[in-house]
From Swiss-Prot:
Organism: Hyphomonas neptunium (strain ATCC 15444)
Annotated BRCT domain residues: 622-701
Protein name: DNA ligase
Entry EC number(s): 6.5.1.2
Task of the protein: DNA ligase that catalyzes the formation of phosphodiester linkages between 5'-phosphoryl and 3'-hydroxyl groups in double-stranded DNA using NAD as a coenzyme and as the energy source for the reaction. It is essential for DNA replication and repair of damaged DNA.
One Gene Ontology term, aspect cellular component: cytosol
Superkingdom to which the source organism belongs: Bacteria
Entries under Pfam families matching the protein: BRCT, DNA_ligase_aden, DNA_ligase_OB, DNA_ligase_ZBD, HHH_2
């Protein structure tokens, strides 16, 4: 298989096939991460796929696919605290696992910014604390709110608890702080304090904590503030958002300002200028890891200049200007007791290793992913074997190898769904290759798929219905009151029709909680375009892709009309080309939408759902720019900024960046070497401008 060959040994045909395989594999992994909140690959495995894709594209630039993978976020807020909406998302960081990953990160930064080789690219470097992220809002120097990270958009309001931490100033010291700012950092518990806490908990007959991070998170999220006050919590400040005015020119200066304002900052943070210095620092910190007073799981590097951070911007889950260099995964040996099958929302069957419980990195592990049947065959693993497992950060543990074979019989992947009994098949793509994952063909008749889709539909990243979580969805489904998304909005009627007692009489509910739930459901009868599309749980169409479609089509009606037209006309239709012409949208997403529309039961479900909800139009951000809402295409060589930076800037101004030229294109920016796109633009009579004219239009001359 071409997937086993070194990149330099691939023929052009093999490279094209490998790029297609990688596009599908990465899209599957992205869907699992963004849609299911259940990553199926370790960070290292995922990064290996992306790096191979990049290497092939670098060697065969002409083969780069339209759906080429591009850089693409914790847990939801609980019910015990008020929700707190972040003024700017609290994003995660992309990871690096090798020295080469770090070097590639620096190369990407230089390429994006268009830096000359001799120009200094400075970074800050600091230990990556393994704790709980916290955002602190200050107005006129006074602490107004403290919020946990949550899902990155909405966290929990833990202000009263945060005020008990000595490292968090209630009033900022010194001067120069902005009128309003969110200071962000990490709540943690020192190792010695953790040991003392667990000793006290054990002496009192209470359950002890697995590790310092769990202890810190559990202590901060106490409903009784006195319990939080009694716990030895610490806080490091290292980032910020939503500052009302600039207060520093570099990351290093900003963190120094935090210290001046009364925050505790990490004394190990340094400013460095070369990749060699970065890697030397990593080795130094790794060597000191065991002796530090707090747990760390890597080192974080950030571009030091804030103007460059602003230019670099963000992708959906992470800033382009920062990366976490993770320490090697921790490993252990245990016995494989059995292999269970989990059925996901899109029907994927995932084998899960059931293990003799073992402690790995301070966490008791009893399950680990086996990914798919090909991986099981590669490992030669079966129940009864002694296996080596590893756990890296918060990634699902994985089985690495068989250490000692057992006496158990060989294990085979079932060819029927263990939940509904439908056939489980490996889909064949256009090139005749089998999908790595076996999928249940039962669709919505499969209870496992139905429940998982319902959970996704009401999740924070989709409709975000307050008080309706996984537990409630499962209960309503088991009772027969909710079988499909539209049933959520018919809950009261369905309960009555099924002859069930009123909701307020159910165990765990009362009159007040029932009223609150019904009100929360009614509040979602108007739903934003992107949330609605993401909520449908269509394969390859997650949070990021849904937002891209919303920005491009603006209204649900026009978008779904294009999907219908593409499904009817096929891949040669103008509608299909319109879908894949959106920058960042590939063939996998477009074809998945067409397949969804092609299923009668999906059309019936969608029609019934649209009788219950109104999908709100996407409103372009009011940037005051003349390009807001315009569809633009870049072609040829840009000389004043890189292509990536130009696209990012256009999107920030509210423009819709497309990858192909059509009659719906408003502006084509053509640089030297522009080819077929320029010819087509001229044939269609579209507005064509040079890079300088474009910069003048957006006010960046």
């Amino acid at each position: 298989m071409s997937g086993d060959k070194p990149v330099e040994a691939l023929s052009e045909a093999e490279a094209a096939a490998e790029l297609e395989r990688l596009a599908r594999a990465i899209a599957d992994a992205d869907a699992a991460y963004y849609q299911n909140d259940a990553p199926e690959l370790t960070d290292a495995d995922y990064d290996a796929l992306r790096q191979r894709n990049l290497a092939i594209e670098a060697r065969f630039p002409a083969l780069k696919r339209e759906d080429s993978p591009t850089d693409r976020v914790g847990a939801e807020a609980g019910d015990g605290f008020a929700k707190a909406r972040h003024s700017a998302p609290m994003l995660s960081l992309d990871n690096a696992f090798t020295d080469e990953d770090v070097a590639d990160f620096a190369v990407r930064i230089r390429r994006f910014l268009g830096l000359a080789p001799e120009e200094t690219l400075a970074f800050t470097a600091e230990p990556k604390i393994d704790g709980l992220s916290l955002s602190l809002t200050y107005e006129n120097g006074k602490l107004m709110r403290a919020a946990t990270r949550g899902d990155g958009q909405t966290g929990e309001d833990v202000t009263a608890n945060a005020r008990t931490l000595g490292d968090i100033p209630v009033k900022l010291k010194g001067k120069g702080w902005p009128e309003r700012i969110e200071v962000r950092g990490e709540v943690y518990m020192a190792k010695s304090a953790f040991a003392d806490l667990n000793a006290r908990e054990a002496e009192a007959g209470r359950k002890v904590f697995a590790n310092p991070r769990n202890a810190a998170a559990g202590s901060l999220r106490q409903l009784d503030v006195e319990i939080t006050k009694s716990r030895p919590l610490r806080f490091f400040a290292y980032a910020w958002a939503a500052a009302s005015e600039p207060f520093a020119q570099t990351q290093f200066e900003a963190v120094k300002a935090f210290a001046d304002w009364g925050f505790v900052t990490n004394s190990r943070m340094i400013r460095i200028k070369t990749v060699e210095e970065v890697l030397s620092y990593y080795q130094e910190i790794e060597a000191e890891r065991a002796s530090l007073e707090y747990d760390i799981d890597g080192v974080v590097y950030k571009v030091d200049r804030l103007d460059w951070q602003q230019r670099l911007g963000f992708v959906s889950r992470a800033p382009r200007w920062a990366i976490a260099h993770k320490f090697p995964a921790e490993k252990a040996v245990t016995t494989l007791l059995g292999i269970d099958i989990q059925v996901g929302r899109t029907g994927s069957l995932t084998p899960v290793a059931r293990l003799e419980p073992v402690t790995v990195g301070g966490v008791v592990v009893s399950n680990a992913t086996l990914h798919n049947e090909d991986e099981i065959a590669r490992l030669g693993v079966k129940p009864g074997d002694k296996v080596e497992i590893q756990r890296a950060g918060d990634v699902i543990p994985q089985v690495l190898r068989v250490v000692e074979p057992g006496q158990g019989a060989p294990w085979a992947m079932p060819d029927t769904c263990p939940v509904c009994g439908s056939a489980a098949v490996r889909e064949i793509d256009d090139a005749g290759r089998a999908d790595v994952r076996r999928r249940c063909t039962g669709g919505l008749i499969c209870p496992a798929q139905a429940v998982e889709r319902l959970k996704h539909f009401v999740s924070r990243k989709a409709l975000d219905i307050d008080g309706l979580g996984e537990k409630q969805v499962l209960l309503f489904h088991e009772k027969g009151a909710v079988k499909a998304p539209q049933d959520i909005f018919r809950l009261k009627k369905n309960i009555e029709a099924a002859g069930l007692p009123p909701l307020e009489e159910w165990e765990g509910f009362g009159a007040q909680s029932a009223r609150k739930l019904y009100s929360a459901i009614d509040a979602r009868r108007k739903v934003p375009f992107a949330r609605f599309l993401n909520g449908l749980g269509i394969r390859y169409v997650g949070q990021t892709t849904s937002a891209q479609f919303a920005r491009s089509f603006l209204s649900w009606q026009s978008f779904w009309a294009a999907v219908k037209a593409a499904e009817e006309g096929g891949i040669e239709s103008e509608a299909y080309n319109e879908l894949i012409g959106i920058d960042g949208i590939g063939q996998a997403a477009a074809r998945s939408l067409m397949a969804f529309e092609g299923e009668p039961h999906n059309r019936e479900m969608l029609a019934a759902l649209l009788e219950e909800v109104e999908v709100e139009d996407e409103i372009p951000a009011e940037t005051g720019s003349p390009v807001t809402g315009k569809t633009v295409v870049f072609t040829g060589t840009l000389e004043k900024m890189t292509r990536d930076e130009a696209k990012a800037r256009a999107s920030a101004l509210g423009a819709k960046v497309a990858g192909t030229v059509s009659a719906k294109t408003d502006i084509v920016i053509a640089g030297p070497g522009a080819g077929s796109k320029l010819v087509k633009a001229e044939q269609l009579g579209l507005a064509v401008m040079t890079e300088d004219e474009w910069l003048a239009l957006i006010g960046e001359t």
